[in-house]
UniProtKB/Swiss-Prot annotation:
Pfam families: CSTF_C, RRM_1. This is mRNA 3'-end-processing protein RNA15. Keywords: mRNA processing, Nucleus, RNA-binding. Residues 99-140 are annotated as: Disordered. RNA-binding component of the cleavage factor IA (CFIA) complex, which is involved in the endonucleolytic cleavage during polyadenylation-dependent pre-mRNA 3'-end formation and cooperates with the cleavage factor NAB4/CFIB and the cleavage and polyadenylation factor (CPF) complex. Binds to A-rich RNA sequence elements. It comes from the Eukaryota. The gene is RNA15. Residues 18-96 form the RRM domain. One of its GO terms (cellular component) is mRNA cleavage and polyadenylation specificity factor complex. It comes from Saccharomyces cerevisiae (strain ATCC 204508 / S288c) (Baker's yeast). GO terms for biological process: mRNA 3'-end processing; mRNA processing. Signal peptide: none annotated. InterPro entries: CSTF_C (IPR026896), CSTF_C_sf (IPR038192), Nucleotide-bd_a/b_plait_sf (IPR012677), RBD_domain_sf (IPR035979), RRM_dom (IPR000504).
Length: 296
């Protein structure tokens, strides 16, 4: 797990609190993804991601309230310097113990803490393609996709947002699930560019579609893994050819089998593991979804 030391002294010097500040968040990260990350270090009571009220864009930082001091201490220990995408997160105790009462002055303080790092990073605006800085913003999504139904709040008592998705899908009759897959397939064929944009803005829809395909017996796990792996494989095929020629295939197969076993651990099994192991498994799952390990 890649890490980088260092966090703003103004944050680090705050006394221990159940509320922590998490900064230097890539702008394409949604509240659900940050909640998923934070839930791996301890039970989350509340999460508030900050958005610019004028543009709806993420400010690149959030406040997270954990259930107890032990969990918030674990977050500071494990998330400060943690690499998320191309950024290294900043995590420290917040000066405000009430996540809903962050004043304008305090927001400006955290804007200053977070600003230099994000302004100098790789989060520059790009007028071409989807506006990732608006990802997860309800107003932006409703304008781009007016027929998209409003979502529901994530139940923070669930272990992960993935469990929330499974719970909601289980409430739908099989006929409704199959109808969704049929309609979504028809729409993506008619509007391929919009479909790509929607899935980039709402990555949870990819999980919904994959789960429906699996639970309805339309696909198997082995059918879906190559689809997630293909873009990464195509991008790095040239570089990997020379490496694969000198690596023992038996060793590669053994590594892939071990990785597959780890990725098949359920949330209950993961929840009893130590903090560092939970974070490592979460990291592996994110890399697998991005196709960094290729097909297996």
């Amino acid at each position: 797990m890649n890490r980088q030391s260092g966090v703003n002294a103004g944050v680090q010097n705050n006394p221990p609190s159940r509320v922590v500040y998490l900064g230097s968040i890539p702008y394409d990260q949604t509240e659900e993804q940050i909640l998923d990350l934070c839930s791996n270090v301890g039970p989350v009571i509340n999460l508030k991601m900050m958005f610019d009220p004028q543009t709806g864009r993420s400010k690149g930082y959030a406040f997270i309230e954990f259930r107890d001091l032990e969990s918030s201490a674990s977050a500071v220990r494990n998330l400060n310097g943690y690499q998320l995408g191309s950024r290294f997160l900043k995590c420290g105790y917040s000066s405000n113990s009430d996540i809903s009462g962050v004043s304008q002055q305090q927001q400006q303080q955290y804007n200053n803490i977070n600003g230099n790092n994000n302004n100098n990073g790789n989060n520059n605006n790009n007028s071409n393609g989807p506006d990732f800085q608006n990802s997860g913003n309800a107003n932006f999504l409703s304008q781009k996709f007016p027929e998209l139904p409003s979502g529901i709040d994530v139940n923070i008592n669930m272990t992960t947002p993935a469990m929330m998705i499974s719970s909601e899908l289980a409430k739908k009759p099989k006929e409704v699930q199959l109808k969704f897959l049929q309609k979504f397939q028809e729409w993506t064929r008619a509007h391929p560019e919009d479909a790509v944009s929607l899935l980039e803005l709402c990555p949870q829809l990819s999980f919904v579609t994959a789960e429906l395909l699996l639970t309805n017996g339309i696909c198997k796990v082995d059918d879906l893994i190559p689809l997630a792996s293909r873009p990464q494989e195509e991008a790095s095929a040239t570089n990997n050819n020379s490496v694969n020629e000198v690596v023992d295939p038996a060793v590669l197969n053994k590594q892939k089998e071990l990785l597959k076993q780890v990725l098949q651990l359920n949330d209950s099994q993961i929840s009893i593991l130590p903090d560092d192991e939970r974070m490592a498994i979460w990291d592996l799952k994110q890399k697998a979804l991005r196709g960094e390990f290729g097909a297996f």
